[in-house]
C-alpha cells in the first residue's frame, strides 16, 4: 500500500495507525482469552510496528513526515481486567516516543489517547464483560444506565450532544476532528501527545 501511495502521489505525508481490538479479560480467563490476546498483540502493537516500517524510509528520504499512533488513556496505567490491552497501548506509547527521539527534525510523531469512542466495533472483542469493572470501577452501574439512555431517542439528555458539558462518549467524527487539528499544525510545530475524552465520560483514568 505504501508503494502504491508513492507511485500515485509521489510522497507519504501522514500515516495514521488506527486499527485495534480490546479483548478485556481477567488473568483467570487466560485459557479462554489466549487466542484473543495474541490477536490483540498482533493488531495493536505489531500492526503499528509494521505500519511505521512501511513508511519510515520514504519519510526520511522526503525529509519530513508525520506518524499518528492511536493509543489509549489506558496505556498510562495498569487496569484490572485489561492487562493485555493496556500493555499493547503502553507499548505503543513507548514506541512512539522512541521513533520521535530517533527522527527529530525529520518525522513528527503524535500519540493520540482517546477514552471511550462509540460507533466502533472495539467492544465486540471483549472476552469477559465483567472485566469492564477495571476501567469503570464504581461508575459501572451508572455507565450501563447511561448507555441505554445514549441509545434511546429522546432520553439522551445531552449525552449525545458534543456542545453539551454532559457529552458522554466521543464519536469517531469528533476524534477525527482532533486528529485533523494535530495534522494541520505547521511542520515546525509537533503535538506529540494528546488525550481526547468526552467532558461527561465515566472512565476512571
Task: Please identify what each model-predicted range represents.
Residues 72:
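Residue(s) in the substrate-gating loop at a strand-loop-helix junction
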Residues 52, 88:
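Active-site helix of classical SDR
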Residues 8-9, 26, 54-63:
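A short helix-coil junction within the Rossmann-fold of NAD(P)-dependent oxidoreductases
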Residues 77-83, 167:
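Active-site loop immediately N-terminal to the catalytic Tyr-X3-Lys motif
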Residues 1-10:
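Conserved amphipathic alpha-helix within the SDR
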Residues 22-38, 61, 81:
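Conserved mid-core segment of classical short-chain dehydrogenase/reductases
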Residues 101-189:
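SDR active-site lid
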Amino acid at each position: 500500500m505504501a508503494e502504491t501511495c508513492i507511485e500515485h502521489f509521489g510522497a507519504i505525508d501522514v500515516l495514521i495507525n488506527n486499527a485495534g481490538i480490546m479483548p478485556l479479560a481477567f488473568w483467570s480467563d487466560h485459557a479462554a482469552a489466549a487466542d484473543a490476546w495474541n490477536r490483540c498483540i498482533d493488531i495493536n502493537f505489531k500492526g503499528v510496528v509494521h505500519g511505521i516500517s512501511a513508511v519510515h524510509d520514504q519519510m526520511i528520504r522526503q525529509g519530513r513526515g508525520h506518524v499518528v499512533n492511536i493509543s489509549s488513556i489506558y496505556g498510562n496505567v495498569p487496569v484490572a481486567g485489561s492487562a493485555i490491552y493496556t500493555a499493547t497501548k503502553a507499548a505503543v506509547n513507548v514506541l512512539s516516543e522512541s521513533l520521535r527521539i530517533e527522527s527529530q527534525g525529520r518525522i513528527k510523531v503524535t500519540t493520540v489517547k482517546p477514552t471511550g469512542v462509540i460507533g466502533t466495533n472495539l467492544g465486540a472483542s471483549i472476552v469477559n464483560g465483567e472485566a469492564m469493572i477495571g476501567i469503570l470501577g464504581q461508575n459501572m452501574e451508572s455507565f450501563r444506565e447511561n448507555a441505554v439512555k445514549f441509545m434511546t431517542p429522546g432520553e439522551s439528555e445531552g449525552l449525545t450532544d458534543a456542545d453539551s458539558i454532559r457529552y458522554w462518549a466521543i464519536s469517531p467524527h469528533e476524534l477525527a476532528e482532533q486528529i485533523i487539528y494535530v495534522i494541520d499544525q505547521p511542520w515546525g510545530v509537533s503535538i506529540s501527545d494528546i488525550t481526547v475524552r468526552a467532558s461527561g465520560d465515566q472512565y476512571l483514568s
